[in-house]
Each structure stands twice: as structure tokens, then as C-alpha cells.
UniProtKB/Swiss-Prot annotation:
Residue span, Death domain: 230-314
Taxonomic lineage: Eukaryota, Metazoa, Chordata, Craniata, Vertebrata
Keywords: Apoptosis, Calmodulin-binding, Cell membrane, Disease variant, Disulfide bond, Glycoprotein, Lipoprotein, Membrane, Palmitate, Phosphoprotein, Receptor, Repeat, Secreted, Signal, Transmembrane, Transmembrane helix
Residue spans of the TNFR-Cys repeats: 47-83, 84-127, 128-166
Oligomer and partners: Component of the death-induced signaling complex (DISC) composed of cell surface receptor FAS/CD95, adapter protein FADD and the CASP8 protease; recruitment of CASP8 to the complex is required for processing of CASP8 into the p18 and p10 subunits. Interacts directly (via DED domain) with NOL3 (via CARD domain); inhibits death-inducing signaling complex (DISC) assembly by inhibiting the increase in FAS-FADD binding induced by FAS activation. Binds DAXX. Interacts with HIPK3. Part of a complex containing HIPK3 and FADD. Binds RIPK1 and FAIM2. Interacts with BABAM2 and FEM1B.
Gene3D superfamilies membership: Death Domain, Fas (1.10.533.10), Tumor Necrosis Factor Receptor, subunit A, domain 2 (2.10.50.10)
Name of the protein in its database record: Tumor necrosis factor receptor superfamily member 6
Effect the entry attributes to changing E272K: In ALPS1A; also found in non-Hodgkin lymphoma; somatic mutation; loss of interaction with FADD
Residues spanning the membrane: 174-190
PANTHER family: TUMOR NECROSIS FACTOR RECEPTOR SUPERFAMILY MEMBER 6
Tissue expression summary: Isoform 1 and isoform 6 are expressed at equal levels in resting peripheral blood mononuclear cells. After activation there is an increase in isoform 1 and decrease in the levels of isoform 6.
């Protein structure tokens, strides 16, 4: 009886060990099967998602040509909601994942283009050159007008090449052109003489009507070539009309935008407009030869009386300054 009680603990320990090994074996087997199942599922999912686009949480198939994506799919591998592009204005020419269609190309008539094939939902517009236009590049953004031949055509203009013209008779035409241009220098010379004659006439009249003698304008122009006109701008503006001032500054570098700006800044004051216009011209021109430019331009415009009036004003002022300076020097020498 004592022997049985001694063996009983050994028997129970052996049974417990056998049970534990059996359970562990079963768990290991289950884990192994679970891992194989996950690998299988992953392989299947990977195969199913090939060629799909990942957007957000899910992958989806592309929209076909002529359509765009309107809403994402809610399940992996599903098709998104696609809607057609606007006919005649938009297109897509291949399967894609975008939510936008492409704009159809415009054939600009101003660049010599016209429509060859209209835009559809699956194809862009195709342009070509208009009649009498050509384009010799691979991608034509604009077409050039065909050359018009005056002396005959060697090869007609095509969509991809310009006209080839004959050159016969070009020398004789050049001769005629020279004959036509030959009188131009003579006309210019005659016109200049007429202006000079008119100015001399005005000069004689002015000399006869004024008691005080005036200098020869040609001599004045030479002596006063570098006079600083900035101190005389207001006086000069006072003897010129607004139209005369505008005409002068336009010919001598002041652009229309600046003329309009000065006009708008002094709408109610034409006198100030003239002053500002002349000042702007003087700043652009600079001090050197500004006097010569003003006088010569007025004479060319047949405004000899005005030119001589400005000469007289400036000359009197300079003469007065010179006399005052001499007088001061004499006083200082006496002291």
C-alpha cells in the first residue's frame, strides 16, 4: 500500500508532461497554418492590385479615354465614378487617373491657322495652315504668309514650304527705284533754302521795326550753343502756344504717355503744361546743344519769328548779366 502512494506522484507528473507537449504541438501547428493563410491572402491581394492606382485609402482602376474621375472608389480594385469630358472643349486620349480633362487646342486665325479636325472627347483638335500660309517646322504654333512674287513664280507655296519667286528684271527695277529716289535730296535742299529765305525775311522785318539792333541769328546760335536753358524754360513757354510746345517735344524724344501724364496732372492750367513739357524735354536732352536744337527745330517748322524772339530774350539777359558783371568789377577795382 505504501508503494502505490509512492508511485502516484510520478505517474501524475508524466501525464502532465505529455498533455503539455500535445497542446504546444497543436498551437504551433495552428500558428503555422495561419501564417501560410496570410501569405496566400497577401499574394492574392498583390496580384489583384497590379495596374491599379493608389489614391487615399484604396486602389482603383483608371477612367477610360474621353472621361475623367468624378469620385474615388470605396473598395480596393473597384472602378471609380467617371464622367464624360465636355464635348468640343475637353478631351483625354488615354486611360488615366486624373479628375480633370485636358483643354482642346485652339487654332488661332491670327497666326494663320485653321481647324483640320475638330476636337472630340477622345482626341485633341488638329490644326493646319490657312490658304496662302505655310509652316516648315515639325510642330506648328503659327503659320507664315506665303510670299507674293512680282516677277513670276518658280514653285507654288505649299502647307510646308514658301513660294519660290523669279528674280528676273530685279536689276532694271532697282534702276527705276534709283531714278525715283534721286530727286529727294534736291527737294530737301530746295525746301531748306525756302525756310532760310523766309527766316531772313522775318529777320529784316524785325530789324526795321525795332530801334535796338539784334545780332545775326546764325552768330547767336553759335555763341549761345551751350547756354543753360533751364533758367529760361518759363519764359520760353510763355511765348509758345501749347500746340507748338507739344509738336516740338514730340519730335525730340518725349513720348505720348508722358505728354498725357503732364496734361492730366495740370488739366486746368495750360501754362503749367507747357512749362512741364519743356522741362521734361530739357532733362532728356541735357544742357549741351539744347539751345541749338530748340532754335533749329523752330526754324524748320517755319516759326522763324518765334525762334528770333527767343534768341532776343536770351541774348538780352546774357548781355545784361555781362554788363552788370563788368560794372561790379569796375567798382571793386576802384575800391
Amino acid at each position: 500500500m505504501l508503494g502505490i502512494w509512492t508511485l502516484l506522484p510520478l505517474v501524475l507528473t508524466s501525464v502532465a508532461r505529455l498533455s503539455s507537449k500535445s497542446v504546444n504541438a497543436q498551437v504551433t501547428d495552428i500558428n503555422s497554418k495561419g501564417l501560410e493563410l496570410r501569405k496566400t491572402v497577401t499574394t492574392v491581394e498583390t496580384q489583384n492590385l497590379e495596374g491599379l492606382h493608389h489614391d487615399g485609402q484604396f486602389c482603383h482602376k483608371p477612367c477610360p479615354p474621353g472621361e475623367r474621375k468624378a469620385r474615388d472608389c470605396t473598395v480596393n480594385g473597384d472602378e471609380p465614378d467617371c464622367v464624360p469630358c465636355q464635348e468640343g472643349k475637353e478631351y483625354t486620349d488615354k486611360a488615366h487617373f486624373s479628375s480633370k480633362c485636358r483643354r482642346c487646342r485652339l487654332c488661332d486665325e491670327g497666326h494663320g491657322l485653321e481647324v483640320e479636325i475638330n476636337c472630340t472627347r477622345t482626341q485633341n483638335t488638329k490644326c493646319r495652315c490657312k490658304p496662302n500660309f505655310f509652316c516648315n517646322s515639325t510642330v506648328c504654333e503659327h503659320c507664315d504668309p506665303c510670299t507674293k512674287c512680282e516677277h513670276g513664280i518658280i514653285k507654288e507655296c505649299t502647307l510646308t514650304s514658301n513660294t519660290k519667286c523669279k528674280e528676273e528684271g530685279s536689276r532694271s527695277n532697282l534702276g527705276w527705284l534709283c531714278l525715283l529716289l534721286l530727286p529727294i535730296p534736291l527737294i530737301v535742299w530746295v525746301k531748306r533754302k525756302e525756310v532760310q529765305k523766309t527766316c531772313r525775311k522775318h529777320r529784316k522785318e524785325n530789324q526795321g521795326s525795332h530801334e535796338s539792333p539784334t545780332l545775326n541769328p546764325e552768330t547767336v546760335a553759335i555763341n549761345l550753343s551751350d547756354v543753360d536753358l533751364s533758367k529760361y524754360i518759363t519764359t520760353i513757354a510763355g511765348v509758345m502756344t501749347l500746340s507748338q510746345v507739344k509738336g516740338f517735344v514730340r519730335k525730340n524724344g518725349v513720348n505720348e504717355a508722358k505728354i498725357d501724364e503732364i496734361k492730366n496732372d495740370n488739366v486746368q492750367d495750360t501754362a503749367e503744361q507747357k512749362v512741364q513739357l519743356l522741362r521734361n524735354w530739357h532733362q532728356l536732352h541735357g544742357k549741351k546743344e539744347a539751345y541749338d536744337t530748340l532754335i533749329k527745330d523752330l526754324k524748320k517748322a517755319n516759326l522763324c519769328t518765334l525762334a528770333e524772339k527767343i534768341q532776343t530774350i536770351i541774348l538780352k539777359d546774357i548781355t545784361s548779366d555781362s554788363e552788370n558783371s563788368n560794372f561790379r568789377n569796375e567798382i571793386q577795382s576802384l575800391v
